């Protein structure tokens, strides 16, 4: 089977003519539909790209807003913690000051009570001494003793006083 040059040229002309006829038929009957489908698809892709871009921008705005809210919340939480620490410190200082004042007041009251007790004891001792002195003077006067006897009597009463 050998193909001659004439057959080859004939086949070429036939195939080329068939392709041209096919292209003319496609242009006449199908090209409008194909072009419409391609145009519709192009518009759909363009809309999808625009929607994706809008969604991306919306997501960025939402992210920025969320970040701002998060930052504000962190700032507010820090302020609340700071205020709580400050209030706690003030209350602690107040309690310490009140406790110190109460301790001073109790100490002063105790010192006052001690001074009063001391004063009462001294007063009682003075009263007791004066009573003993009066009693001693009465005994001395009633006993008409000489100086040695008076001295012994005074020493005896002072010893009794020391034991009391």
From Swiss-Prot:
CDD domains: ATP-synt_Fo_b. Pfam families: ATP-synt_B. It is a single-pass membrane protein. The keyword Repressor does not apply. One of its GO terms (molecular function) is proton-transporting ATP synthase activity, rotational mechanism. The keyword DNA-binding does not apply. It comes from the Bacteria. Keywords: ATP synthesis, Cell membrane, CF(0), Hydrogen ion transport, Ion transport, Membrane, Transmembrane, Transmembrane helix, Transport. The chain crosses the membrane at residues 6-26. InterPro entries: ATP_synth_B-like_membr_sf, ATP_synth_b/b'su_bac/chlpt, ATP_synth_F0_bsu_bac, ATP_synthase_B_chain. F(1)F(0) ATP synthase produces ATP from ADP in the presence of a proton or sodium gradient. F-type ATPases consist of two structural domains, F(1) containing the extramembraneous catalytic core and F(0) containing the membrane proton channel, linked together by a central stalk and a peripheral stalk. During catalysis, ATP synthesis in the catalytic domain of F(1) is coupled via a rotary mechanism of the central stalk subunits to proton translocation. Component of the F(0) channel, it forms part of the peripheral stalk, linking F(1) to F(0). PANTHER family: ATP SYNTHASE SUBUNIT B, ATP SYNTHASE SUBUNIT B', CHLOROPLASTIC. This is ATP synthase subunit b. It comes from Streptococcus pyogenes serotype M49 (strain NZ131).
């Amino acid at each position: 089977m050998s193909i001659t040059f004439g057959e080859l040229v004939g086949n070429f002309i036939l195939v080329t003519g068939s392709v041209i006829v096919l292209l003319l038929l496609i242009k006449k009957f199908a090209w409008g539909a194909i072009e419409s489908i391609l145009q519709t698809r192009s518009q759909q892709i363009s809309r999808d790209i625009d929607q994706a871009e809008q969604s991306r921008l919306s997501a960025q705005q939402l992210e920025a807003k969320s970040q701002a809210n998060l930052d504000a919340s962190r700032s507010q939480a820090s302020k609340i913690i700071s205020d709580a620490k400050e209030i706690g410190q003030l209350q602690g200082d107040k309690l310490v000051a009140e406790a110190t004042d109460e301790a001073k007041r109790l100490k002063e009251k105790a010192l006052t009570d001690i001074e009063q007790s001391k004063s009462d004891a001294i007063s009682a001792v003075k009263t007791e001494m004066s009573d003993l002195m009066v009693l001693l003077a009465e005994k001395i006067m009633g006993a008409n003793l000489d100086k040695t006897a008076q001295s012994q009597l005074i020493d005896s009463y002072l010893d009794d006083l020391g034991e009391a």
